[in-house]
Amino acid sequence: MSDQIKHTSSQNFSDGELVSVLTTQPIDRFLDYKAPKEGVNLGSYVEVPLGPRKVIGVVWCAGKGDYDQNKIRTISNRLDVPEMRPEMMEFLSRVGRYTLTPLNGMLKLATRAPGLTDPPSMKIVYAKGDGDVDRMTPARERVLKILKDTADMQFTGKELKEAANVTISVIKGLVSQGAVAELESPRDIPYAELDPCLPSKKLTSAQKDAGDRLRKNIRMNTYNTTLLRGITGSGKTEVYLEAVAECLLLGKQALILIPEIALTVEFLDRLKKRFGQKPAQWHSGVTMTEKRRCWRMVAEAKAQVVVGARSSLYL
């Protein structure tokens, strides 16, 4: 399968035009399909018929049409997800060539989020209601106090249970009386905005010098590699966070790639202290629902920082 194709973000294809689709199936070539009535763009995620099945693919380039066009089938569905960026298409191609991995295998790595063919889903959340409680108990009081103190927030059942240290039956009882409102909310919501201007730990002169160099490299907007040498506990992480902060100041996204064993609560709390909120996460301990949210928010540029294990490289 040749991937020597120049990708341009302006390519779009109207109803019936031929497009070449890369699927995740073990097929060593692109497959030609006709664009659906609503059209598709370069990088559109689509669902296409392949034999009796429907499989996920990406519109990779214009179709070749080098066989009987009467046998070419039409794309079944254009998925309601952001298009793959030309930079990502080029990245997958380059990594595939470097690692001798077929391009369909690379696409499989980039589409590991579950439920990509599903429409945006909803979840049940809880907020303060307008009703009165007929009988107050300590458990009910804790729930209502939390909702009153955080009136601008919504909680899932699990979050509210843990915050108030109550059972779900306590929450449901308050819902039945209208004191707590049970609402539907989009499941794939953006992550809280991070603040790169929050003060960092006091850096030594050597750390500050290294951090300044990293920030300068980020501002140059070109690829570069920087290796920090230092013993454990010497503050290398704080220096790398200076580079992350510069990315955020420039409106860019950042990926912090670390071994899964290092993905600890303490490390995430450290990032929260530096930027005001916890970042998105991608690793084996993350639920499938949260992985779908992370994948979508990264694609929509609504996840500023992702902390992840190796597989997060292909988000």
Residue ranges and their predicted role:
Residues M1-L315:
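Accessory, non-ATPase domains that flank or precede helicase/AAA+ motor cores in DNA-metabolism machines
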